[in-house]
Protein backbone atom coordinates (compact mmCIF):
# COMPACT_ATOMS: atom_id res chain seq x y z
CA UNK A 1 0.00 0.00 0.00
CA UNK A 2 1.14 3.50 -0.76
CA UNK A 3 -0.12 7.03 -0.58
CA UNK A 4 0.03 8.14 -4.19
CA UNK A 5 0.68 11.56 -5.68
CA UNK A 6 -2.47 13.36 -6.80
CA UNK A 7 -2.53 14.47 -10.44
CA UNK A 8 -3.70 18.04 -10.97
CA UNK A 9 -5.36 19.95 -13.81
CA UNK A 10 -4.24 20.19 -16.64
CA UNK A 11 -2.76 16.64 -16.49
CA UNK A 12 -4.18 14.82 -19.57
CA UNK A 13 -4.96 11.67 -17.56
CA UNK A 14 -7.78 13.64 -15.92
CA UNK A 15 -9.37 14.30 -19.33
CA UNK A 16 -9.21 10.72 -20.60
CA UNK A 17 -12.21 8.42 -20.02
CA UNK A 18 -11.09 5.45 -17.93
CA UNK A 19 -11.15 1.85 -19.10
CA UNK A 20 -13.40 -0.78 -17.56
CA UNK A 21 -11.64 -3.28 -15.31
CA UNK A 22 -11.97 -6.60 -17.12
CA UNK A 23 -10.08 -8.82 -14.67
CA UNK A 24 -9.19 -8.59 -10.99
CA UNK A 25 -5.40 -8.84 -11.11
CA UNK A 26 -2.76 -8.24 -8.43
CA UNK A 27 -2.26 -4.79 -9.98
CA UNK A 28 -5.97 -3.98 -9.52
CA UNK A 29 -5.77 -5.15 -5.89
CA UNK A 30 -2.75 -2.86 -5.32
CA UNK A 31 -4.65 -0.01 -6.97
CA UNK A 32 -7.56 -0.45 -4.55
CA UNK A 33 -5.16 -0.55 -1.59
CA UNK A 34 -3.50 2.65 -2.81
CA UNK A 35 -6.86 4.38 -3.41
CA UNK A 36 -8.01 3.48 0.10
CA UNK A 37 -4.79 4.62 1.73
CA UNK A 38 -4.64 7.85 -0.28
CA UNK A 39 -8.28 8.83 0.42
CA UNK A 40 -7.89 8.13 4.15
CA UNK A 41 -7.03 11.69 5.13
CA UNK A 42 -9.21 14.38 6.71
CA UNK A 43 -11.02 16.47 4.13
CA UNK A 44 -10.86 13.86 1.39
CA UNK A 45 -14.29 12.57 0.39
CA UNK A 46 -13.46 10.63 -2.77
CA UNK A 47 -10.60 9.72 -5.08
CA UNK A 48 -10.75 8.26 -8.58
CA UNK A 49 -8.05 6.06 -10.09
CA UNK A 50 -7.13 8.60 -12.77
CA UNK A 51 -6.41 11.15 -10.03
CA UNK A 52 -3.44 8.95 -9.12
CA UNK A 53 -2.51 8.37 -12.75
CA UNK A 54 -4.29 5.06 -13.45
CA UNK A 55 -6.89 5.11 -16.24
CA UNK A 56 -9.16 2.40 -14.81
CA UNK A 57 -12.76 2.71 -13.61
CA UNK A 58 -12.35 2.65 -9.83
CA UNK A 59 -12.78 5.07 -6.97
CA UNK A 60 -12.52 5.14 -3.20
CA UNK A 61 -14.49 7.22 -0.73
CA UNK A 62 -14.32 8.45 2.85
CA UNK A 63 -17.67 9.91 3.93
CA UNK A 64 -18.74 10.30 7.56
CA UNK A 65 -16.25 7.67 8.72
CA UNK A 66 -17.28 5.15 6.05
CA UNK A 67 -14.35 4.20 3.84
CA UNK A 68 -14.74 1.99 0.78
CA UNK A 69 -14.30 1.56 -2.96
CA UNK A 70 -16.15 0.49 -6.07
CA UNK A 71 -14.87 -0.92 -9.36
CA UNK A 72 -16.55 -0.25 -12.72
CA UNK A 73 -19.10 2.14 -11.21
CA UNK A 74 -22.12 3.13 -13.27
CA UNK A 75 -24.20 6.12 -12.21
CA UNK A 76 -27.67 4.66 -12.66
CA UNK A 77 -29.94 7.12 -10.92
CA UNK A 78 -29.96 10.69 -9.68
CA UNK A 79 -32.72 13.00 -8.52
CA UNK A 80 -33.45 16.24 -6.73
CA UNK A 81 -31.08 19.17 -6.72
CA UNK A 82 -28.42 20.66 -4.49
CA UNK A 83 -26.32 23.76 -4.94
CA UNK A 84 -23.22 24.00 -2.82
CA UNK A 85 -19.48 24.25 -2.49
CA UNK A 86 -17.41 21.71 -4.33
CA UNK A 87 -13.68 21.20 -4.43
CA UNK A 88 -11.31 18.61 -5.85
CA UNK A 89 -7.92 17.21 -4.95
CA UNK A 90 -6.95 17.67 -8.60
CA UNK A 91 -7.88 21.36 -8.42
CA UNK A 92 -6.13 22.31 -5.16
CA UNK A 93 -7.07 25.51 -3.44
CA UNK A 94 -10.27 26.24 -5.37
CA UNK A 95 -13.87 25.79 -4.23
CA UNK A 96 -16.87 26.79 -6.30
CA UNK A 97 -20.61 26.44 -5.91
CA UNK A 98 -21.93 23.80 -8.30
CA UNK A 99 -25.30 22.26 -9.09
CA UNK A 100 -25.64 18.53 -8.68
CA UNK A 101 -28.47 16.11 -8.15
CA UNK A 102 -29.09 15.70 -4.43
CA UNK A 103 -29.49 11.91 -4.58
CA UNK A 104 -27.35 9.50 -6.59
CA UNK A 105 -27.02 5.73 -6.89
CA UNK A 106 -24.00 3.92 -8.33
CA UNK A 107 -23.68 0.21 -9.09
CA UNK A 108 -20.38 -1.62 -9.54
CA UNK A 109 -18.38 -4.54 -8.14
CA UNK A 110 -15.84 -5.27 -5.43
CA UNK A 111 -12.55 -7.19 -5.68
CA UNK A 112 -14.42 -10.51 -5.40
CA UNK A 113 -16.78 -9.64 -8.26
CA UNK A 114 -19.72 -9.09 -5.90
CA UNK A 115 -22.21 -6.38 -6.77
CA UNK A 116 -21.81 -3.12 -4.85
CA UNK A 117 -24.53 -0.47 -4.67
CA UNK A 118 -23.70 2.92 -3.20
CA UNK A 119 -26.35 5.57 -2.77
CA UNK A 120 -26.93 8.70 -0.83
CA UNK A 121 -27.95 12.32 -0.68
CA UNK A 122 -26.08 15.47 0.22
CA UNK A 123 -22.32 14.98 0.39
CA UNK A 124 -22.56 11.28 -0.53
CA UNK A 125 -24.69 12.05 -3.59
CA UNK A 126 -22.31 14.82 -4.64
CA UNK A 127 -19.25 12.58 -4.20
CA UNK A 128 -20.75 9.74 -6.26
CA UNK A 129 -21.44 12.09 -9.17
CA UNK A 130 -18.06 13.85 -8.82
CA UNK A 131 -16.08 10.58 -8.94
CA UNK A 132 -18.10 9.18 -11.86
CA UNK A 133 -17.41 12.44 -13.71
CA UNK A 134 -13.69 11.90 -13.14
CA UNK A 135 -13.87 8.38 -14.57
CA UNK A 136 -15.57 9.80 -17.68
CA UNK A 137 -12.75 12.34 -18.17
CA UNK A 138 -14.44 15.36 -16.58
CA UNK A 139 -13.56 17.61 -13.65
CA UNK A 140 -16.00 19.68 -11.63
CA UNK A 141 -14.73 22.86 -13.31
CA UNK A 142 -16.63 21.68 -16.40
CA UNK A 143 -19.87 22.33 -14.49
CA UNK A 144 -19.08 25.97 -13.72
CA UNK A 145 -20.47 29.03 -15.42
CA UNK A 146 -18.27 30.25 -18.27
CA UNK A 147 -16.54 33.10 -16.38
CA UNK A 148 -15.87 31.05 -13.24
CA UNK A 149 -14.48 28.22 -15.35
CA UNK A 150 -12.19 30.61 -17.23
CA UNK A 151 -10.99 32.10 -13.91
CA UNK A 152 -10.30 28.65 -12.42
CA UNK A 153 -8.40 27.40 -15.47
CA UNK A 154 -6.32 30.59 -15.50
CA UNK A 155 -5.49 30.02 -11.82
CA UNK A 156 -4.45 26.41 -12.53
CA UNK A 157 -2.25 27.43 -15.50
CA UNK A 158 -0.53 30.10 -13.39
CA UNK A 159 -0.08 27.61 -10.54
CA UNK A 160 1.54 25.12 -12.90
CA UNK A 161 3.90 27.77 -14.33
CA UNK A 162 5.41 28.44 -10.89
Swiss-Prot record:
CDD domains: Pep_deformylase. Binds 1 Fe(2+) ion. Fe cation binds at residues 88, 130, 134. It catalyses: N-terminal N-formyl-L-methionyl-[peptide] + H2O = N-terminal L-methionyl-[peptide] + formate. The active site is at 131. GO terms for molecular function: metal ion binding; peptide deformylase activity. Gene3D superfamilies: Peptide deformylase. Its cofactor is Fe(2+). Its EC number is 3.5.1.88. GO terms for biological process: co-translational protein modification; translation. Keywords: Hydrolase, Iron, Metal-binding, Protein biosynthesis. NCBIfam families: pept_deformyl, PRK00150.1-3. Belongs to the polypeptide deformylase family. PANTHER family: PEPTIDE DEFORMYLASE, PEPTIDE DEFORMYLASE, MITOCHONDRIAL. This is Peptide deformylase 2. It comes from Bifidobacterium longum (strain NCC 2705). The lineage of its organism: Bacteria, Bacillati, Actinomycetota, Actinomycetes, Bifidobacteriales.
Amino acid sequence: MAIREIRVVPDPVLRTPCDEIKEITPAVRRLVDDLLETVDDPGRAGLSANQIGVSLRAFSYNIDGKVGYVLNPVLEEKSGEQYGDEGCLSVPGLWYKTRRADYARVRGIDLDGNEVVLEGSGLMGRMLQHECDHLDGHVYLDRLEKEERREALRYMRNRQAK
